[in-house]
């Protein structure tokens, strides 16, 4: 009976260890995905800021061209 009890505890312990390792890997993968999404958002924001500064400059140049 003691042999079965030890075997059961060993199986439960190994299952718990593998479960915790899987959860850790899943959490790391989610963090990597979030970082990638944040980098894409930053690139989009930079592009929007560039276009936002480019439009007034272009309008200013066009008004000078037509006035001039």
From Swiss-Prot:
Expressed by the skin glands. It comes from the Eukaryota. One of its GO terms (cellular component) is extracellular region. It is found in: Secreted. GO terms for biological process: defense response to Gram-negative bacterium; defense response to Gram-positive bacterium; defense response to protozoan; hemolysis in another organism; innate immune response. Residues 23-45 are annotated as: Disordered. It holds the Pfam family FSAP_sig_propep. Residues 1-22 form the signal peptide. Residues 23-47 form a propeptide. The keyword Secreted applies. Residues 26-42 have a biased composition (Acidic residues). The keyword Disulfide bond does not apply. Keywords: Amidation, Amphibian defense peptide, Antibiotic, Antimicrobial, Cleavage on pair of basic residues, Cytolysis, Hemolysis, Immunity, Innate immunity, Secreted, Signal. The modification Lysine amide is found at residue 67. Belongs to the frog skin active peptide (FSAP) family. Antimicrobial peptide that displays antibacterial and antiprotozoal activity. Exhibits antibacterial activity against the Gram-positive bacteria S.epidermidis ATCC 12228 (MIC=2 uM), E.casseliflavus ATCC 700327 (MIC=16 uM), S.aureus ATCC 25923 (MIC=4 uM) and E.faecalis ATCC 29212 (MIC=8 uM), and the Gram-negative bacteria E.coli ATCC 25922 (MIC=16 uM) and K.pneumoniae ATCC 13883 (MIC=4 uM). Displays antiprotozoal activity against the epimastigote form of T.cruzi (IC(50)=15.9 uM). This is Figainin 1. It comes from Boana raniceps.
């Amino acid at each position: 009976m003691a042999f079965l009890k030890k075997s059961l505890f060993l199986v439960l312990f190994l299952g718990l260890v593998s479960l915790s390792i899987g959860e850790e890997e899943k959490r790391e993968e989610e963090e990597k995905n979030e970082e990638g999404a944040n980098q894409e958002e930053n690139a989009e924001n930079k592009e929007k800021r560039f276009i936002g500064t480019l439009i007034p400059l272009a309008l200013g140049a066009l008004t000078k061209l037509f006035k001039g």
